[in-house]
């Protein structure tokens, strides 16, 4: 019993105890409804309804609060799996590619996770955010009472695994269109900026083929004009060291060595620059991507320029956590 003053009962004590006794009973139908609304577990829903006196809205907030706390605990785990997705505007002139990471490939294949990634892509397509911090602080389109970051935390609580919106890139082309391509079920996503005065099926097919080229051969640049002098000098230093470490080449005159370096740089640029690469579908095995684009332009009476591209690969640059299942279970049980 609660006390007031010198051991006497508080005048409010009886009221509080009466309210505790008459708290609304939680029914199975209420638990079912809350589960459908939130995706939370049965016992969690039952507790939320009990704690909020059966108020459904407050119960949802209660679960969100608990979910956010759970998400904070999960945030220490590495999210290196996941999927990449793309979305193109109705007029075809703007497109976005996003990467959302999860901890396991199992969750990456989950329908709820995939649906959430598509919603992130919709958000990113409409976003004017200059960086990820600004994007995460934006209001969530489907529920402006939440930020993008808060909606992510809610999804983490529902799905039960740490997730991260790692990055997005939006490309716009007012004088043509942006093509998109997804490879291997979301492992790789590509956007291609195509400037053209003719837009038809043949030009769209060309853009898709170029996107597939990018996905397969992973170029670093669109053309040589994009290659920085720093990159070239760095590669020259590596080639120079290779020559000096080769007894057969180290003894050659400096002029010959420099000629060898220039030749190897030229060859490397053809491999890392998209338009200089050999087109993967070239019938003669020699046609460059640039030559392929020009052939399509000529056949359609068009002027076509591949201005730039974006290529995302799931988890690239991230460390993947290797931990066996037994160890994970032991950790969960506090062993």
Residues of each region from the PLM?
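Intrinsically disordered, low-complexity segments enriched in serine/proline and basic residues
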Residues: 4-12
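N-terminal assembly/interaction segments in proteins that build large macromolecular machines
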Residues: 12-20, 25-335
């Amino acid at each position: 019993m609660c006390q007031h003053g010198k051991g006497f009962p508080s005048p409010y004590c009886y009221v509080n105890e009466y309210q505790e006794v008459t708290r609304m009973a939680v029914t199975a139908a209420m638990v079912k409804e809350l589960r459908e609304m939130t995706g939370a577990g049965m016992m969690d829903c039952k507790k939320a309804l009990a704690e909020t006196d059966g108020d459904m809205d407050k119960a949802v907030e209660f679960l969100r609060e608990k979910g956010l706390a759970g998400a904070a605990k999960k945030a220490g785990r590495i999210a290196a799996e996941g999927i990449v997705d793309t979305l193109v505007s109705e007029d075809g002139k703007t497109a976005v590619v996003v990467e959302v990471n999860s901890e396991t490939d199992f969750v990456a294949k989950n329908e709820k996770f995939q649906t959430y990634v598509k919603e992130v892509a919709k958000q990113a397509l409409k976003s004017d955010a200059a960086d990820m911090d600004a994007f995460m602080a934006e209001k969530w389109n489907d529920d402006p009472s939440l930020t993008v970051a808060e909606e992510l935390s809610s999804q983490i609580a529902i799905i039960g695994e740490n997730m991260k919106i790692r990055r997005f890139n939006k490309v716009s082309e007012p004088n043509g269109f942006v093509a998109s391509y997804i490879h291997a079920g979301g492992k790789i996503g590509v956007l291609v900026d195509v400037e053209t005065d003719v837009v038809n099926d043949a030009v769209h097919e060309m853009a898709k083929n170029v996107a597939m080229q990018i996905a397969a051969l992973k170029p670093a640049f669109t053309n040589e004009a994009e290659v920085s002098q720093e990159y070239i000098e760095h590669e020259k230093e590596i080639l120079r060291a290779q020559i000096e470490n080769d007894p057969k080449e180290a003894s050659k005159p400096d002029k010959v060595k420099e000629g060898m370096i220039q030749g190897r740089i030229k060859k490397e640029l053809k491999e890392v620059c998209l338009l200089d690469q050999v087109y993967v579908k070239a019938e003669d095995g020699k046609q460059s991507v640039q030559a392929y684009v020009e052939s399509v332009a000529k056949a359609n009476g068009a002027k076509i320029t591949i201005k730039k591209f974006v290529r995302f690969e799931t988890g690239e640059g991230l460390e993947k956590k290797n931990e066996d299942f037994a160890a994970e279970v032991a950790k969960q049980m506090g062993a």
